[in-house]
Amino acid sequence: MIWRTILFAFATAAYADYDCHVSLWRGESLSFLLPDEACEVSGEAPGIEVQTGTLLPVRYLADNAALEYKTVADRAVYGSRAPGVHFATVMASRGADSGSYRFGNLVVTVVDRTLPPPKEWKYYLDLWQHPWAVARVNGCEPFSPSHYKAMEPLWRQLADAGQKTLTVTLVDRPWNKQCRDAYHSMVVRRKDAMGKWSFDYSRFDEYVVFGRACGIGPHISCYTMCPWEYVVDYEGPDGTTVKMVAKPGTAEFDDYWHDFLEDFERHLKEKGWLSDTYVAMDERSPEDLDYIAKFVRHVAPGLKISVAGNRPLSAFAGIDIDSYSHSFRRMDDQFIRDALLRKRQGLITTYYVCCEPPRPNTFMGSGAGEAFVCSFYPVVLNLDGFLRWAYNSWGEDPLRDMTYRRWASGDTALVYPDGSPSWRFLELKNGIQQAEKFCILHDMGARKDDLDELRRMFVLRDVQTGTDYARLRDKVIEILNKR
């Protein structure tokens, strides 16, 4: 088994007496590995909660070519006392008094600074959700009461990490057959014998209300006007399903999307959601994006445009994009300069990782600190946050095996169907909170020398090609938690 490198960056461990020391701000939730089974954690303190558990082993495909499988301690089960790798999560309320507190062998220091609630974080987190995967693993009818009940703890856990956008679908299979479970449309469309379109938004509305009640938002990312096969399904006059190819620039595209966008914009205005709604495209060609952006601006100017792009930003020059996420593999100094210009214009800019790069990433086989660096590094580059395509797009038996086809294991999910987070997700959340703290200190004009030191530690080419990510993580937490 691969054992996770012990995460005690923000801490020092006095192994002689097994005392463990961690520091955090008020309002922060910090997860870390316990250094030894002899590190007893017990006791209470006002405003501080400590939960412990075990990282249970999960199988994954480690080498596609050799079909070599391994196991890794990744599924974080709170309350478990099973043998193996143990961890703890410390939560300090915003009303907690600063100072040091002892919980058995664990010493927690609350720093006299406060992290606001996740809803107020400036950090822009966009992990794509997959409702139909939840329905399948729980044996539920999609969007039934039991389905919503199964989704709720997973969606609330994501909201607690600062998730800013709800993933919704305007067409069937926007990513074709990429996932184990198909995405379906949350909008029903019909075309009568006279060629008139009508739309039913009942499921869309219900799901948006649910997502916001879980704390996700305020943005709504609508996939997509450019599905991978350009197919739009609709119900014909006789009630049968018709598959129409509607490629940007064709009469079919213009006819359907014109009527839909006009009606959709009207509906969003009535619901009060228009200013929060984005038409989202994933890794589409500049030609398609240019046509769609101009089309949307003409027909439904109240809607925004969101793009994840795997080409140089210059390839999209002249295209009006409100929220842009750039492939981390293609990051360079020119993009960083362009992103700063976008920030000054009030536009959202993030980066994403997916099946690439090999590192840093959030795969089952990723090294210590990689997930943390993925989520923290954007603020060093003056970006707004981080995007990843799959929060919960599970394979066949994710509680036991995170393999999906021959993709890099872990690429498709950061949580488990029973609501357990992965260790990768907890490290990602640690990085997000440190990023928010970095931004708070920067906006206050505080600790400038320390923040400059952190910036100098991150060299783009080193981060892209491989470095000591655990050391970077450790130094970030040490500096940001100074008293």
Stretches found by the model and what they are:
Residues 1-8:
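Sec-dependent signal peptide recognition
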Residues 14-33:
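Beta-sheet-dominated interaction scaffolds and their linkers
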Residues 33, 37-75:
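Surface-exposed binding patches on compact interaction domains or structured appendages
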Residues 34, 279, 304-309, 322-329:
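Short, hydrophobic beta-strand segments that form beta-sheet elements in well-ordered domains
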Residues 79, 87-94, 100-299, 308-318, ...:
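Aromatic-lined carbohydrate-binding surfaces of glycoside hydrolases
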Residues 231-233, 245-249, 253, 257-277, ...:
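Catalytic domains of carbohydrate-active enzymes that cleave complex glycans
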Residues 323-402, 406-407:
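Catalytic-core region of carbohydrate-active enzymes that cleave or remodel glycosidic bonds
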